[in-house]
Amino acid sequence: MEDIMTSLLVATSRVVVTISLAYVPVKSAFAAPQNAAGLCSAIAASSIPASRISLPTTGAKIQSATLIGGSDPANQNGEYCKVIGQIKPVDPKAPDIIWQVNLPSVWNGKMLQYGGGGYNGSIPPTTDKTTLGLDVVPTPLTQGYVTFGSDSGHQAPNADDASFAKNDEAMLNYGYMHIKKVLDVAKVLVTERYEKPVTRVYFQGGSTGGREGLTAASRWPESYDGILTNYPTANFVGLRLWGAGLARAVYDDKSAGWIPPKLVERISKEALKSCDGLDGVEDGLVGNMQQCRAQSAVLVQSLACKSDVTGNPDDCLTQAQIERTLKIYHEGYSLPYQLANGINTYPGYNSLEGIMMQLGSEPQMRTPPVSGPNAHHSSRSFEFLQNFVQRDQPLNLLSFDIREPGKLKDRIVELSDVIGATRTDWSTFSDRGGKIIWLQGNDDPSVSPLGNAKLFESIVAKMGADKVKGFMRFFLVPGLAHGGGRFSPTWDNLAALDNWVEHDVPPSNPVVVDATKSSTKGRSRPLCEYPSWPKYKGDGDVAIASSFSCADD
């Protein structure tokens, strides 16, 4: 497998050299002054040669270009040309990259790329608001941004399907290549449509889309000016290994580690009851997470079975559940080898601090595992190990040892660089004025908040706190899960990023509004720069951000 991947990467570098030497500016097929409808129609009849895409392809084709009228009752984004097309692969067996570019008739000179989710497989909603953006703020497209995104180079019925990764080109596209290929295509369309230069390029997304944003800025720092990244799967391979380790902890030895849903819910409620007031107010949110984690051992002891119980009781925790499942869920794991950028740990989750562990409704693991009935991470970890790592050989998830993966170790380490955003030196991006706003939820059950906090700390250790503060802001948000949660922070994040890039005005404890569909909808809190957290001042309306200050004690 490594030889195949290396061959493709070598071929990639050769094609890039050939493209750069052979590049000849292509005369526009649709640049003549026309009205918006005429320009959009001209795009439909065009194509983009491989020479205008900086990574290996066989060119891009336009599938359709449709002018969406500003008076269309189904359109709230103003008049724009909706362009859909394909980037054709080098390998004829690889899937196309399906993309969408939205060209507003009134353009502000800026572009916004949208990231995907899970294993992708479909185009993200490029006409919608940003991830965690305010509903009352006009969409980026309405504001005049060219918005665009892609399926990352394969088509799938859902974001859990990773079968595409058995093809090297499709796997590399998913890992990082689709990001730049689609940007290049979008820039060609922008140049030809408007005949004036792009002033700014931004990227926004959450989860996989958050990882893609960090990847974009770290791999092509000269191409991006600002990134909005939310709960990114930055250590993608580390997360997938954690899911495999969790599966063994839960389902090995006749599922001795499986915790029934009733007990999972009780753990969450007891933790919240114990920790809710540590930030000065009982509001359903745990702000002082550090102190809460310090109390976790007491919580476990209070829920432990009083006698040597076996099986999976729903009223107390057995030793197997404590020593296996809770240990890896709460503390994570360490490896005797290093992934990309020297990482050999994956910290756990706030599983004893109020989040709902996702351990599935069934005590036995299905073959293959399925999210919902089985632990959430087990299914995506199986998909990763089967399709990215093992590929053609059947995989037994419960026999896979993340610490001793044998002959698969080199492949795992290699993939951690291909599909990951854990680099710690951002000097090139920061030196040219690039900015990053990064949100991570403390209640996230899918991406470890401790892991992303540790990555941020590594960036600070590498570059120095003052330099990092000049281009990156990292906010840990109480109550935010993997999107949604007990507190869903929404704000005009694109305006905050643009203001920082354009005017060098960084976001300073910005106010976010809870969009959770519950009785608490509309309450506000300050975003606090890590490691600080929102602490109630002791008086004032608990639903208003001004009643809180950012504390780190």
UniProtKB/Swiss-Prot annotation:
The keyword Calcium applies. Coiled coil: none annotated. Residues 1-31 form the signal peptide. The active site is at S207 (acyl-ester intermediate), D444 (charge relay system), H482 (charge relay system). This is Uncharacterized esterase Atu5261. It is an enzyme of class 3 (hydrolase). GO terms for molecular function: carboxylic ester hydrolase activity; metal ion binding.
